[in-house]
Amino acid sequence: MSSKTRKSSRVILEHEYVPEHRLLSIEEAVQVLKMLGIKPWQLPKISVNDPIARLLKAKPGDIIEITRRSYTAGEAKYYRFVVAYQKGVK
C-alpha cells in the first residue's frame, strides 16, 4: 500500500459515521472475555481483510473494540474477533 493510499485510508477512521475502533491488548481482551463469560470465537467476526482491520494492522485472533454513539445509552461498546477467511469459505 502506498503512503498516499495509506494516508487517504486513515481518513475513513475520521468520518463521522465510522465509530471509533481500536485493538485490545491481550490483557484487555482477557478481561472483556471474562466479563462477558464467553470464548473469543463466540464474538461476532471481522475479516482480517476488512479495511478497518487492515488500518489497525489486526491479525487473526485479535479483538477489536468498537465504540458507537447510542441515543439511549450515550455510548455502547461492541467487540469483534479478527478471523482470516479463506477464499470461497464463509
Swiss-Prot record:
Coiled coil: none annotated. It catalyses: RNA(n) + a ribonucleoside 5'-triphosphate = RNA(n+1) + diphosphate. Gene3D superfamilies: RPB5-like RNA polymerase subunit. GO terms for biological process: transcription by RNA polymerase II; transcription elongation by RNA polymerase I; tRNA transcription by RNA polymerase III. It is found in: Cytoplasm. Pfam families: RNA_pol_Rpb5_C. GO terms for molecular function: DNA binding; DNA-directed RNA polymerase activity. GO terms for cellular component: cytoplasm; DNA-directed RNA polymerase complex. InterPro entries: Arch_Rpo5/euc_Rpb5, RNA_pol_subH/Rpb5_C, RNA_pol_subH/Rpb5_CS, RPB5-like_sf. Its EC number is 2.7.7.6. Keywords: Cytoplasm, DNA-directed RNA polymerase, Nucleotidyltransferase, Transcription, Transferase. Its main location: cytoplasm. DNA-dependent RNA polymerase (RNAP) catalyzes the transcription of DNA into RNA using the four ribonucleoside triphosphates as substrates. Belongs to the archaeal Rpo5/eukaryotic RPB5 RNA polymerase subunit family. Part of the RNA polymerase complex. PANTHER family: DNA-DIRECTED RNA POLYMERASES I, II, AND III SUBUNIT RPABC1. HAMAP family: RNApol_Rpo5_RPB5. This is DNA-directed RNA polymerase subunit Rpo5. It comes from Aeropyrum pernix (strain ATCC 700893 / DSM 11879 / JCM 9820 / NBRC 100138 / K1).
